[in-house]
Protein backbone atom coordinates (compact mmCIF):
# COMPACT_ATOMS: atom_id res chain seq x y z
CA UNK A 1 0.00 0.00 0.00
CA UNK A 2 1.43 3.39 -0.99
CA UNK A 3 1.91 5.90 1.81
CA UNK A 4 2.83 9.55 2.02
CA UNK A 5 6.48 9.40 3.04
CA UNK A 6 6.37 12.83 4.71
CA UNK A 7 3.34 12.09 6.89
CA UNK A 8 3.31 11.40 10.63
CA UNK A 9 1.78 8.34 12.22
CA UNK A 10 -1.98 8.66 12.73
CA UNK A 11 -4.16 6.48 14.95
CA UNK A 12 -6.68 4.72 12.70
CA UNK A 13 -9.80 2.99 14.00
CA UNK A 14 -10.04 0.11 11.54
CA UNK A 15 -13.54 -0.94 12.54
CA UNK A 16 -15.52 1.22 14.93
CA UNK A 17 -14.89 3.22 18.14
CA UNK A 18 -16.65 0.40 20.02
CA UNK A 19 -13.67 -1.85 19.21
CA UNK A 20 -10.74 0.45 20.10
CA UNK A 21 -8.34 -2.50 20.21
CA UNK A 22 -8.83 -2.95 16.44
CA UNK A 23 -6.56 -0.08 15.49
CA UNK A 24 -3.27 0.80 13.85
CA UNK A 25 -0.80 3.68 13.78
CA UNK A 26 -0.13 4.45 10.13
CA UNK A 27 1.07 7.09 7.71
CA UNK A 28 -1.54 8.68 5.50
CA UNK A 29 -1.95 6.42 2.45
CA UNK A 30 -1.84 7.69 -1.12
CA UNK A 31 -5.11 7.49 -3.03
CA UNK A 32 -4.33 5.60 -6.25
CA UNK A 33 -7.87 5.62 -7.58
CA UNK A 34 -10.95 7.87 -7.65
CA UNK A 35 -10.49 11.36 -6.25
CA UNK A 36 -11.48 12.42 -2.73
CA UNK A 37 -11.36 15.78 -0.97
CA UNK A 38 -11.70 15.43 2.80
CA UNK A 39 -12.45 18.72 4.52
CA UNK A 40 -10.43 19.57 7.67
CA UNK A 41 -7.82 16.97 6.76
CA UNK A 42 -4.16 17.64 7.56
CA UNK A 43 -1.37 17.24 5.02
CA UNK A 44 0.81 15.10 7.26
CA UNK A 45 -1.42 13.40 9.86
CA UNK A 46 -0.52 13.00 13.51
CA UNK A 47 -3.53 15.00 14.77
CA UNK A 48 -4.90 14.88 18.31
CA UNK A 49 -7.38 12.03 18.89
CA UNK A 50 -10.95 13.35 18.85
CA UNK A 51 -10.17 16.59 17.00
CA UNK A 52 -11.91 17.32 13.72
CA UNK A 53 -8.50 17.07 12.01
CA UNK A 54 -8.00 13.56 13.40
CA UNK A 55 -11.56 12.60 12.39
CA UNK A 56 -10.85 13.80 8.85
CA UNK A 57 -7.53 11.94 8.68
CA UNK A 58 -9.10 8.78 10.13
CA UNK A 59 -11.90 8.91 7.55
CA UNK A 60 -9.43 9.53 4.72
CA UNK A 61 -7.43 6.45 5.74
CA UNK A 62 -10.57 4.28 5.78
CA UNK A 63 -11.82 5.62 2.45
CA UNK A 64 -8.47 5.41 0.67
CA UNK A 65 -7.59 1.95 1.94
CA UNK A 66 -11.04 0.72 0.93
CA UNK A 67 -10.79 2.16 -2.58
CA UNK A 68 -7.25 0.91 -3.10
CA UNK A 69 -8.07 -2.62 -1.96
CA UNK A 70 -11.27 -2.92 -4.01
CA UNK A 71 -9.98 -1.23 -7.17
CA UNK A 72 -9.08 -4.55 -8.80
CA UNK A 73 -12.73 -5.65 -8.67
CA UNK A 74 -14.14 -2.58 -10.46
CA UNK A 75 -15.05 -2.67 -14.16
CA UNK A 76 -11.88 -1.52 -15.88
CA UNK A 77 -13.36 1.67 -17.32
CA UNK A 78 -14.66 3.06 -14.00
CA UNK A 79 -12.23 5.83 -13.14
CA UNK A 80 -14.48 8.50 -11.63
CA UNK A 81 -17.62 9.00 -9.60
CA UNK A 82 -21.09 8.99 -11.15
CA UNK A 83 -21.73 12.73 -11.01
CA UNK A 84 -18.52 14.44 -9.88
CA UNK A 85 -14.78 14.22 -10.47
CA UNK A 86 -13.93 14.86 -6.83
CA UNK A 87 -16.04 13.43 -3.99
CA UNK A 88 -16.04 15.89 -1.07
CA UNK A 89 -16.15 14.50 2.48
CA UNK A 90 -17.62 16.53 5.37
CA UNK A 91 -16.56 15.04 8.74
CA UNK A 92 -18.84 17.29 10.81
CA UNK A 93 -21.74 18.21 8.54
CA UNK A 94 -24.08 19.11 11.41
CA UNK A 95 -25.98 17.68 14.35
CA UNK A 96 -28.18 14.72 13.49
CA UNK A 97 -28.20 10.95 13.92
CA UNK A 98 -27.31 10.56 10.28
CA UNK A 99 -24.87 10.23 7.40
CA UNK A 100 -25.51 10.31 3.68
CA UNK A 101 -24.21 10.27 0.10
CA UNK A 102 -25.64 12.83 -2.34
CA UNK A 103 -23.64 12.23 -5.55
CA UNK A 104 -21.25 15.11 -4.90
CA UNK A 105 -20.28 14.42 -1.30
CA UNK A 106 -20.29 12.19 1.76
CA UNK A 107 -21.71 13.95 4.82
CA UNK A 108 -21.26 12.70 8.37
CA UNK A 109 -23.18 14.07 11.34
CA UNK A 110 -22.96 13.87 15.12
CA UNK A 111 -25.54 13.57 17.89
CA UNK A 112 -26.00 12.91 21.59
CA UNK A 113 -26.40 9.26 22.51
CA UNK A 114 -29.92 8.32 23.55
CA UNK A 115 -28.35 5.93 26.06
CA UNK A 116 -25.98 8.20 28.01
CA UNK A 117 -25.90 11.61 26.31
CA UNK A 118 -22.35 11.17 25.03
CA UNK A 119 -21.56 12.93 21.75
CA UNK A 120 -21.34 10.38 18.93
CA UNK A 121 -19.49 11.25 15.71
CA UNK A 122 -20.57 9.03 12.82
CA UNK A 123 -17.34 9.86 10.96
CA UNK A 124 -15.25 8.01 13.57
CA UNK A 125 -16.74 4.67 12.52
CA UNK A 126 -15.04 3.04 9.56
CA UNK A 127 -18.22 0.98 9.12
CA UNK A 128 -20.31 4.11 8.56
CA UNK A 129 -17.67 5.87 6.46
CA UNK A 130 -17.22 2.92 4.10
CA UNK A 131 -20.97 2.20 4.02
CA UNK A 132 -21.54 5.67 2.57
CA UNK A 133 -18.60 5.11 0.23
CA UNK A 134 -20.38 1.94 -0.87
CA UNK A 135 -23.29 4.03 -2.14
CA UNK A 136 -20.85 6.12 -4.18
CA UNK A 137 -19.13 3.00 -5.56
CA UNK A 138 -22.40 1.39 -6.62
CA UNK A 139 -23.55 4.66 -8.16
CA UNK A 140 -20.33 4.85 -10.19
CA UNK A 141 -20.79 1.29 -11.46
CA UNK A 142 -24.58 1.41 -11.92
CA UNK A 143 -25.83 5.00 -12.23
CA UNK A 144 -29.08 3.63 -13.69
CA UNK A 145 -29.99 2.42 -10.18
CA UNK A 146 -30.02 5.97 -8.77
CA UNK A 147 -33.50 7.05 -9.88
CA UNK A 148 -35.04 3.62 -10.43
CA UNK A 149 -38.50 3.48 -8.83
CA UNK A 150 -38.14 0.05 -7.25
CA UNK A 151 -38.07 -0.76 -3.56
CA UNK A 152 -35.70 -3.73 -3.83
CA UNK A 153 -33.12 -1.72 -5.77
CA UNK A 154 -33.16 0.87 -2.99
CA UNK A 155 -32.81 -1.87 -0.37
CA UNK A 156 -29.90 -3.37 -2.30
CA UNK A 157 -28.17 0.02 -2.36
CA UNK A 158 -28.23 -0.10 1.46
CA UNK A 159 -27.07 -3.72 1.52
CA UNK A 160 -24.21 -2.96 -0.87
CA UNK A 161 -23.04 -0.20 1.48
CA UNK A 162 -23.04 -2.64 4.39
CA UNK A 163 -21.18 -5.25 2.34
CA UNK A 164 -18.50 -2.76 1.32
CA UNK A 165 -18.02 -1.96 5.02
CA UNK A 166 -17.74 -5.67 5.83
CA UNK A 167 -15.40 -6.49 2.95
CA UNK A 168 -13.30 -3.44 3.75
CA UNK A 169 -12.37 -4.45 7.29
CA UNK A 170 -11.63 -7.98 6.10
CA UNK A 171 -8.74 -6.48 4.10
CA UNK A 172 -6.83 -5.87 7.34
CA UNK A 173 -4.59 -8.62 8.67
CA UNK A 174 -5.17 -7.61 12.28
CA UNK A 175 -8.94 -7.96 11.77
CA UNK A 176 -8.60 -11.43 10.28
CA UNK A 177 -6.31 -12.59 13.08
CA UNK A 178 -8.55 -11.14 15.79
CA UNK A 179 -11.84 -12.45 14.42
CA UNK A 180 -10.46 -15.97 14.07
CA UNK A 181 -9.22 -15.88 17.67
CA UNK A 182 -12.42 -14.31 19.04
CA UNK A 183 -14.71 -16.80 17.30
CA UNK A 184 -12.36 -19.80 17.37
CA UNK A 185 -12.96 -19.98 13.62
CA UNK A 186 -16.76 -20.19 13.93
CA UNK A 187 -18.11 -17.19 12.03
CA UNK A 188 -21.72 -18.31 12.48
CA UNK A 189 -22.23 -16.12 15.52
CA UNK A 190 -22.42 -12.42 16.32
CA UNK A 191 -19.00 -10.85 15.89
CA UNK A 192 -17.43 -7.45 15.31
CA UNK A 193 -17.12 -8.11 11.57
CA UNK A 194 -20.78 -9.03 11.06
CA UNK A 195 -22.02 -6.24 13.34
CA UNK A 196 -22.03 -2.88 11.59
CA UNK A 197 -21.70 0.53 13.32
CA UNK A 198 -21.78 -0.89 16.83
CA UNK A 199 -21.20 2.41 18.64
CA UNK A 200 -23.95 4.14 16.67
CA UNK A 201 -26.29 1.23 17.35
CA UNK A 202 -25.55 1.28 21.08
CA UNK A 203 -26.26 5.02 21.13
CA UNK A 204 -29.72 4.24 19.72
CA UNK A 205 -30.05 1.32 22.15
CA UNK A 206 -29.89 -1.26 19.36
CA UNK A 207 -27.85 -4.38 20.22
CA UNK A 208 -25.30 -5.93 17.83
CA UNK A 209 -24.85 -2.81 15.71
CA UNK A 210 -27.22 -0.82 13.52
CA UNK A 211 -27.47 -3.91 11.35
CA UNK A 212 -25.98 -7.37 11.59
CA UNK A 213 -24.88 -9.43 8.59
CA UNK A 214 -25.24 -12.55 10.74
CA UNK A 215 -29.01 -12.93 10.64
CA UNK A 216 -31.71 -15.38 9.59
CA UNK A 217 -34.05 -13.02 7.73
CA UNK A 218 -35.77 -14.49 4.69
CA UNK A 219 -37.32 -12.83 1.66
CA UNK A 220 -40.96 -11.77 1.92
CA UNK A 221 -42.74 -9.70 -0.71
CA UNK A 222 -42.17 -6.23 0.79
CA UNK A 223 -45.75 -5.21 -0.07
CA UNK A 224 -46.93 -7.72 2.54
CA UNK A 225 -44.75 -6.30 5.33
CA UNK A 226 -45.78 -3.69 7.92
CA UNK A 227 -44.30 -0.24 7.38
CA UNK A 228 -43.26 0.27 11.01
CA UNK A 229 -42.33 -1.64 14.14
CA UNK A 230 -39.76 -4.19 15.14
CA UNK A 231 -38.54 -7.00 12.90
CA UNK A 232 -38.51 -6.95 9.11
CA UNK A 233 -40.56 -4.03 7.74
CA UNK A 234 -41.12 -2.26 4.44
CA UNK A 235 -38.25 0.18 4.84
CA UNK A 236 -35.13 -0.05 2.71
CA UNK A 237 -32.59 -0.17 5.56
CA UNK A 238 -34.58 -2.86 7.34
CA UNK A 239 -35.22 -4.92 4.20
CA UNK A 240 -31.57 -4.71 3.13
CA UNK A 241 -30.61 -7.24 5.81
CA UNK A 242 -32.22 -10.03 3.75
CA UNK A 243 -29.58 -9.68 1.02
CA UNK A 244 -26.77 -8.85 3.45
CA UNK A 245 -27.55 -11.94 5.52
CA UNK A 246 -27.59 -14.16 2.44
CA UNK A 247 -24.26 -12.76 1.24
CA UNK A 248 -22.63 -13.26 4.65
CA UNK A 249 -24.01 -16.82 4.73
CA UNK A 250 -22.44 -17.50 1.32
CA UNK A 251 -19.11 -16.03 2.43
CA UNK A 252 -19.02 -18.18 5.59
CA UNK A 253 -20.09 -21.31 3.70
CA UNK A 254 -17.27 -20.88 1.17
CA UNK A 255 -14.81 -20.18 4.00
CA UNK A 256 -15.92 -23.43 5.68
CA UNK A 257 -15.72 -25.38 2.40
CA UNK A 258 -12.14 -24.17 1.91
CA UNK A 259 -10.99 -25.31 5.34
CA UNK A 260 -11.78 -22.64 8.00
CA UNK A 261 -8.21 -21.32 8.06
CA UNK A 262 -6.84 -17.80 7.71
CA UNK A 263 -5.96 -18.54 4.09
CA UNK A 264 -9.50 -19.88 3.57
CA UNK A 265 -11.02 -16.68 4.92
CA UNK A 266 -8.90 -14.51 2.63
CA UNK A 267 -9.73 -16.69 -0.38
CA UNK A 268 -13.45 -16.72 0.46
CA UNK A 269 -13.41 -12.94 0.87
CA UNK A 270 -11.95 -12.45 -2.61
CA UNK A 271 -14.29 -15.02 -4.18
CA UNK A 272 -17.46 -13.36 -2.88
CA UNK A 273 -16.16 -9.86 -3.63
CA UNK A 274 -15.52 -10.81 -7.26
CA UNK A 275 -18.90 -12.53 -7.50
CA UNK A 276 -20.62 -9.44 -6.11
CA UNK A 277 -18.91 -6.91 -8.39
CA UNK A 278 -19.20 -9.04 -11.54
CA UNK A 279 -22.89 -9.71 -10.87
CA UNK A 280 -23.77 -6.12 -10.01
CA UNK A 281 -22.19 -5.04 -13.29
CA UNK A 282 -24.40 -7.42 -15.28
CA UNK A 283 -27.72 -7.64 -13.44
CA UNK A 284 -30.73 -5.93 -15.03
CA UNK A 285 -32.61 -3.34 -12.98
CA UNK A 286 -35.73 -5.44 -12.48
CA UNK A 287 -38.59 -5.08 -10.01
CA UNK A 288 -37.79 -8.39 -8.27
CA UNK A 289 -34.18 -7.35 -7.95
CA UNK A 290 -33.03 -9.76 -5.22
CA UNK A 291 -34.24 -12.70 -7.32
CA UNK A 292 -32.53 -11.36 -10.45
CA UNK A 293 -29.25 -10.75 -8.63
CA UNK A 294 -29.29 -14.23 -7.09
CA UNK A 295 -29.68 -15.77 -10.55
CA UNK A 296 -26.94 -13.51 -11.85
CA UNK A 297 -24.52 -14.60 -9.12
CA UNK A 298 -25.13 -18.26 -9.96
CA UNK A 299 -24.58 -17.59 -13.67
CA UNK A 300 -21.45 -15.59 -12.83
CA UNK A 301 -20.09 -18.41 -10.66
CA UNK A 302 -20.59 -20.78 -13.57
CA UNK A 303 -18.68 -18.44 -15.86
CA UNK A 304 -15.72 -17.51 -13.63
CA UNK A 305 -15.48 -20.46 -11.21
CA UNK A 306 -16.83 -23.36 -13.25
CA UNK A 307 -19.80 -23.75 -10.85
CA UNK A 308 -17.49 -24.48 -7.89
CA UNK A 309 -19.75 -22.62 -5.47
CA UNK A 310 -23.13 -22.82 -7.22
CA UNK A 311 -24.51 -25.41 -4.80
CA UNK A 312 -23.72 -23.08 -1.89
CA UNK A 313 -25.36 -20.14 -3.66
CA UNK A 314 -28.47 -22.14 -4.51
CA UNK A 315 -28.80 -23.56 -0.99
CA UNK A 316 -28.50 -20.13 0.64
CA UNK A 317 -30.84 -18.37 -1.77
CA UNK A 318 -33.44 -21.14 -1.40
CA UNK A 319 -33.16 -21.07 2.40
CA UNK A 320 -33.69 -17.30 2.36
CA UNK A 321 -36.65 -17.58 -0.08
CA UNK A 322 -34.81 -15.34 -2.54
CA UNK A 323 -35.06 -18.18 -5.06
CA UNK A 324 -37.99 -20.59 -5.25
CA UNK A 325 -37.88 -24.29 -6.08
CA UNK A 326 -39.28 -23.37 -9.48
CA UNK A 327 -36.45 -20.88 -10.04
CA UNK A 328 -33.90 -23.57 -9.28
CA UNK A 329 -35.56 -26.04 -11.66
CA UNK A 330 -35.43 -23.51 -14.48
CA UNK A 331 -31.86 -22.37 -13.94
CA UNK A 332 -30.53 -24.53 -16.74
CA UNK A 333 -32.70 -22.56 -19.16
CA UNK A 334 -31.84 -19.38 -21.00
CA UNK A 335 -33.47 -17.04 -18.50
CA UNK A 336 -30.22 -16.93 -16.53
CA UNK A 337 -27.75 -17.32 -19.36
CA UNK A 338 -25.16 -14.65 -20.01
CA UNK A 339 -25.92 -12.89 -23.28
CA UNK A 340 -23.11 -13.10 -25.79
CA UNK A 341 -21.22 -10.05 -27.01
CA UNK A 342 -22.91 -10.36 -30.39
CA UNK A 343 -26.26 -9.44 -28.83
CA UNK A 344 -25.23 -6.00 -27.68
CA UNK A 345 -28.60 -4.62 -28.77
CA UNK A 346 -29.74 -5.83 -25.35
CA UNK A 347 -27.36 -3.42 -23.65
CA UNK A 348 -28.75 0.00 -22.93
CA UNK A 349 -29.09 2.54 -20.17
CA UNK A 350 -32.63 2.83 -18.88
CA UNK A 351 -34.47 6.10 -19.33
CA UNK A 352 -37.98 4.69 -19.69
CA UNK A 353 -40.35 6.93 -17.74
CA UNK A 354 -44.07 7.05 -16.94
CA UNK A 355 -46.38 9.30 -14.97
CA UNK A 356 -47.99 8.00 -11.77
CA UNK A 357 -50.62 9.65 -9.59
CA UNK A 358 -49.85 9.69 -5.88
CA UNK A 359 -50.72 11.94 -2.95
CA UNK A 360 -52.54 14.39 -5.26
CA UNK A 361 -49.45 14.67 -7.46
CA UNK A 362 -48.82 13.60 -11.04
CA UNK A 363 -45.18 12.51 -10.96
CA UNK A 364 -42.83 11.33 -13.69
CA UNK A 365 -40.75 8.36 -12.54
CA UNK A 366 -38.02 6.18 -14.02
CA UNK A 367 -39.20 2.61 -14.36
CA UNK A 368 -37.29 -0.37 -13.13
CA UNK A 369 -37.44 -2.66 -16.13
CA UNK A 370 -35.05 -4.72 -18.23
CA UNK A 371 -32.33 -2.09 -18.24
CA UNK A 372 -28.59 -2.56 -18.34
CA UNK A 373 -25.89 0.02 -17.91
CA UNK A 374 -23.26 -0.65 -20.55
CA UNK A 375 -20.04 -0.06 -18.61
CA UNK A 376 -17.69 -1.39 -21.25
CA UNK A 377 -19.01 -1.38 -24.78
CA UNK A 378 -18.41 -4.66 -26.60
CA UNK A 379 -17.10 -6.21 -23.36
CA UNK A 380 -20.03 -6.30 -20.95
CA UNK A 381 -22.16 -9.42 -21.15
CA UNK A 382 -25.55 -8.72 -19.64
CA UNK A 383 -27.91 -11.17 -18.00
CA UNK A 384 -31.02 -12.23 -19.88
CA UNK A 385 -33.65 -11.85 -17.17
CA UNK A 386 -36.84 -10.08 -18.16
CA UNK A 387 -39.85 -8.80 -16.27
CA UNK A 388 -43.37 -7.78 -17.22
CA UNK A 389 -44.00 -4.09 -17.93
CA UNK A 390 -47.17 -4.28 -15.83
CA UNK A 391 -45.05 -5.27 -12.82
CA UNK A 392 -42.78 -2.29 -13.47
CA UNK A 393 -45.73 0.13 -13.65
CA UNK A 394 -47.30 -1.25 -10.48
CA UNK A 395 -43.99 -1.16 -8.64
CA UNK A 396 -43.42 2.46 -9.66
CA UNK A 397 -46.77 3.48 -8.17
CA UNK A 398 -46.18 1.39 -5.04
CA UNK A 399 -42.69 2.83 -4.62
CA UNK A 400 -43.86 6.45 -4.85
CA UNK A 401 -46.58 5.72 -2.27
CA UNK A 402 -43.89 4.20 -0.04
CA UNK A 403 -41.77 7.35 -0.34
CA UNK A 404 -44.71 9.54 0.66
CA UNK A 405 -45.53 7.27 3.61
CA UNK A 406 -41.97 7.70 4.93
CA UNK A 407 -41.86 11.45 4.24
CA UNK A 408 -38.92 10.88 1.90
CA UNK A 409 -40.31 12.88 -0.98
CA UNK A 410 -41.02 16.59 -1.36
CA UNK A 411 -40.92 19.73 -3.48
CA UNK A 412 -37.64 20.89 -1.97
CA UNK A 413 -34.20 19.30 -1.97
CA UNK A 414 -34.18 18.72 1.79
CA UNK A 415 -35.89 15.38 1.25
CA UNK A 416 -34.30 12.19 -0.08
CA UNK A 417 -36.35 12.53 -3.29
CA UNK A 418 -37.26 15.75 -5.09
CA UNK A 419 -40.23 16.47 -7.38
CA UNK A 420 -38.69 18.69 -10.04
CA UNK A 421 -41.51 21.03 -11.04
CA UNK A 422 -39.33 22.55 -13.78
CA UNK A 423 -38.95 19.14 -15.43
CA UNK A 424 -42.45 17.65 -15.77
CA UNK A 425 -42.60 16.85 -12.04
CA UNK A 426 -39.80 14.34 -12.54
CA UNK A 427 -38.91 12.35 -9.43
CA UNK A 428 -35.17 12.69 -8.75
CA UNK A 429 -33.17 11.16 -5.94
CA UNK A 430 -31.16 13.71 -3.94
CA UNK A 431 -29.34 11.48 -1.49
CA UNK A 432 -28.89 8.01 -0.04
CA UNK A 433 -29.50 8.68 3.62
CA UNK A 434 -29.01 6.60 6.75
CA UNK A 435 -32.14 8.18 8.21
CA UNK A 436 -33.01 5.15 10.35
CA UNK A 437 -36.69 5.48 9.46
CA UNK A 438 -37.40 2.18 11.17
CA UNK A 439 -36.55 3.69 14.58
CA UNK A 440 -39.69 4.85 16.38
CA UNK A 441 -40.24 6.98 19.45
CA UNK A 442 -41.01 3.92 21.55
CA UNK A 443 -37.31 3.03 21.45
CA UNK A 444 -35.72 6.44 22.04
CA UNK A 445 -35.03 7.89 25.46
CA UNK A 446 -36.42 11.36 26.01
CA UNK A 447 -39.24 10.89 23.51
CA UNK A 448 -42.86 10.99 24.73
CA UNK A 449 -43.62 7.40 23.72
CA UNK A 450 -40.42 5.88 25.14
CA UNK A 451 -40.85 2.36 26.57
CA UNK A 452 -44.28 1.84 25.12
CA UNK A 453 -45.33 -1.03 22.89
CA UNK A 454 -45.21 -0.48 19.12
CA UNK A 455 -48.43 -1.68 17.56
CA UNK A 456 -48.45 -3.28 14.10
CA UNK A 457 -49.01 -1.47 10.84
CA UNK A 458 -52.81 -1.82 10.79
CA UNK A 459 -53.03 0.06 14.09
CA UNK A 460 -49.81 2.04 14.13
CA UNK A 461 -48.73 4.01 17.15
CA UNK A 462 -47.71 3.25 20.70
CA UNK A 463 -49.63 1.82 23.59
CA UNK A 464 -48.44 0.69 27.05
CA UNK A 465 -46.66 -2.61 26.56
CA UNK A 466 -48.50 -5.48 28.13
CA UNK A 467 -51.56 -3.20 28.40
CA UNK A 468 -51.72 -2.78 32.21
CA UNK A 469 -55.14 -3.44 33.76
CA UNK A 470 -55.04 -0.18 35.72
CA UNK A 471 -53.19 3.02 35.03
CA UNK A 472 -51.16 2.57 38.22
CA UNK A 473 -49.99 -0.94 37.36
CA UNK A 474 -46.36 -1.31 36.34
CA UNK A 475 -46.07 -2.32 32.68
CA UNK A 476 -44.57 -5.68 31.81
CA UNK A 477 -41.04 -6.03 30.52
CA UNK A 478 -41.96 -6.32 26.86
CA UNK A 479 -41.53 -3.73 24.16
CA UNK A 480 -42.92 -5.01 20.86
CA UNK A 481 -46.01 -7.13 20.22
CA UNK A 482 -45.61 -9.67 17.46
CA UNK A 483 -49.32 -10.13 16.80
CA UNK A 484 -51.74 -7.80 15.04
CA UNK A 485 -54.59 -6.66 17.24
CA UNK A 486 -57.25 -3.98 17.10
CA UNK A 487 -56.31 -2.18 20.28
CA UNK A 488 -55.02 -2.48 23.81
CA UNK A 489 -57.02 -4.82 25.99
CA UNK A 490 -56.47 -7.17 28.87
CA UNK A 491 -56.09 -10.15 26.54
CA UNK A 492 -52.78 -8.82 25.22
CA UNK A 493 -50.16 -10.30 27.52
CA UNK A 494 -46.43 -10.80 27.57
CA UNK A 495 -46.92 -14.08 25.69
CA UNK A 496 -48.13 -12.00 22.73
CA UNK A 497 -44.82 -10.20 22.57
CA UNK A 498 -41.46 -11.34 21.31
CA UNK A 499 -38.97 -8.60 22.08
CA UNK A 500 -37.88 -7.99 25.65
CA UNK A 501 -36.70 -4.62 26.88
CA UNK A 502 -33.03 -4.22 26.02
Regions found by a protein language model. Name each.
Residues 52-126, 138-452, 479, 487-501:
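Zinc-dependent metallohydrolase catalytic domains
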Residues 450-463:
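Long, compositionally biased low-complexity repeat segments characteristic
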Residues 132:
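Walker B catalytic acidic pair
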Residues 470-475:
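Extracellular/cell-surface secretome signature
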Residues 129:
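A conserved beta-strand element that flanks and buttresses the S-adenosyl-L-methionine
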Residues 1-52:
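Non-catalytic architectural context of zinc metalloproteases
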Amino acid sequence: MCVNATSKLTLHYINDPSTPNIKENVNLPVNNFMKLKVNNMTDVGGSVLGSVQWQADNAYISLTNCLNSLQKFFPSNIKKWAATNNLVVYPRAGKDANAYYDRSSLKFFYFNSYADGKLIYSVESSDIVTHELGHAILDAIRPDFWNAAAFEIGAFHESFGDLIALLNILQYDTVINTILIDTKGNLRQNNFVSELAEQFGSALEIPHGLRNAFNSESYVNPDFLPSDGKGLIKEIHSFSVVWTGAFYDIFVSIYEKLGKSKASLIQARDIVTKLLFESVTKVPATVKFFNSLAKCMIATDKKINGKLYSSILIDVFKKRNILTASDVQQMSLSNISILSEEKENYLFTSNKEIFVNSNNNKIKVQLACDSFHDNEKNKLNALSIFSDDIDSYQEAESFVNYLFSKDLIGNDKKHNWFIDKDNDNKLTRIKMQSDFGFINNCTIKGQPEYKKCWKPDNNSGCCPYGCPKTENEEPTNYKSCAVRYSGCNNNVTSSSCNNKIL
